[in-house]
């Protein structure tokens, strides 16, 4: 990590020259850190796309035909009616071999390391910018990667790190068997890679957890409750719950009160319920409040989600089902392993769901999207830096042409500091 020591920058005996040299060195460091920010961000986006297009993840997330919830009545019934498919729909079962799960967890670990490197680089970048601008307004972070851990989030992360679950039993032959719960998680996660800022839509989840138990893949998120009486937060929470239900991703909501209780026991209990549950699992979900929910926002954001989901869902089913098969009703039929009783499966010998290379090739040619564009600062903040950054004093002997050339060179340097501007 770069040593953040302003005294180490510049060493001329002349005060003016030292100041000018220090400033140029700082500009170079800002440019260097900004370049690294882009590199880490692009590496993160590329690896994240690899995970999201892995055959096991595609099979898990995109089995259900989409169900649109575009009225308050449908949404309310989804979360409150005991006979609704929210509570009765069987969860999809996705199996993964040890070979595949090892690769998946290795990618998750690398993704976490890239996220940590991005945070360190972002801190260095902000440090050097502060050295030049002194008192600057704090601008919003336009990539979800820039959000740092809060004490509450750190507590949950530490708890997940310390969970070691091993199930022991004796088989029919009297042999002692030990089965380990394999867990990997990442903070600040989105399930898509094609939106410009990611924070424009409420798709950012506090924790994304990958769990493998007896070669069964289970995905769930942990959400931290905030101001549940805030209309915007309430609406976004409902949208998130619908999205997660559609993708079969289980949900555990954590509140401040749960931290005072035994948080570790609560998470362990949820994990054990997840591996044994035959239905979709959502603990402490938020029930829609007609006085808080913004249905216009719900329709707008869900439409974006359905467009993306429909593409992946169609591809998944086309790889398994005959083209003439009509998709089953998700309420009347129960899914298991992505298949439904009464559906004629394709007998395409070329396709094998364990054939990673074949599956990835199809996804890569048809369904990949442009990655996020890393924005370090907004246009307004960029202009503000140009205007507020202290200018080098002009000298009388400089001609107007020289001054103009110097200012243009300085502007070019500033433009390079903030990366690509959209």
UniProtKB/Swiss-Prot annotation:
InterPro entries xrefs: DUF5889
Biased composition (Low complexity): 7-22
Superkingdom, natural source: Viruses
Location of the region described as Disordered in the Swiss-Prot/TrEMBL record: 1-22
Protein name: Uncharacterized protein R650
Organism of this sequence: Acanthamoeba polyphaga mimivirus (APMV)
């Amino acid at each position: 990590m770069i040593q953040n020591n302003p005294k180490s920058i510049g060493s001329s005996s002349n005060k003016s020259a030292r100041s000018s040299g220090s400033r140029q060195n700082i500009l170079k460091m800002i440019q260097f850190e900004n370049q690294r920010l882009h590199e880490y961000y692009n590496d993160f986006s590329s690896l994240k796309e690899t995970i999201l297009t892995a055959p096991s993840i595609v099979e898990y997330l995109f089995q259900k035909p989409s169900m649109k919830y575009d009225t308050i009545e449908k949404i309310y019934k989804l979360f409150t009616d005991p006979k609704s498919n929210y509570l009765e729909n069987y969860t999809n079962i996705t199996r993964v071999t040890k070979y595949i799960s090892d690769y998946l967890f290795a990618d998750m670990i690398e993704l976490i390391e890239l996220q940590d490197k991005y945070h360190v680089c972002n801190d260095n970048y902000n440090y050097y910018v502060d050295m030049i601008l002194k008192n600057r307004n704090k601008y919003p972070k336009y990539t979800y990667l820039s959000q740092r851990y809060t004490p509450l989030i750190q507590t949950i992360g530490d708890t997940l790190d310390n969970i070691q679950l091993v199930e022991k039993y004796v088989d029919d032959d009297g042999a002692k068997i030990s089965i380990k719960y394999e867990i990997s998680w990442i903070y600040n996660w989105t399930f898509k890679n094609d939106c410009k800022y990611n924070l424009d839509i409420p798709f950012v989840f506090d924790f994304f957890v990958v769990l493998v138990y007896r070669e069964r893949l289970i995905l769930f998120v942990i959400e931290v409750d905030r101001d549940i009486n805030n209309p915007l937060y309430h609406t976004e929470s409902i949208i998130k719950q619908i999205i997660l239900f559609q993708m079969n991703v289980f949900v555990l909501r954590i509140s401040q009160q749960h931290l005072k209780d035994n948080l570790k026991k609560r998470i362990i209990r949820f994990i054990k319920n997840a591996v044994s549950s035959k239905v979709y699992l959502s603990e402490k979900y938020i029930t829609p409040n007609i006085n808080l929910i913004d249905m216009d926002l719900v329709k707008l954001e869900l439409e974006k989600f359905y467009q993306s989901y429909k593409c992946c869902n169609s591809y998944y089913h086309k790889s398994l089902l005959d083209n003439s098969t009509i998709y089953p009703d998700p309420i009347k039929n129960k899914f298991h392993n992505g298949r439904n009783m009464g559906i004629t499966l394709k007998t395409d010998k070329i396709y094998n769901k364990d054939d990673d290379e074949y599956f990835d090739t199809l996804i890569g040619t048809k369904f990949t999207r442009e990655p996020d564009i890393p924005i370090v600062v907004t246009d307004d903040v960029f202009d503000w830096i140009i205007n507020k950054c202290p200018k080098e004093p002009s000298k009388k002997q400089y001609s107007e042409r020289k001054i103009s050339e110097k200012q243009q060179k300085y502007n070019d340097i500033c433009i390079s500091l903030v990366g690509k501007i959209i």
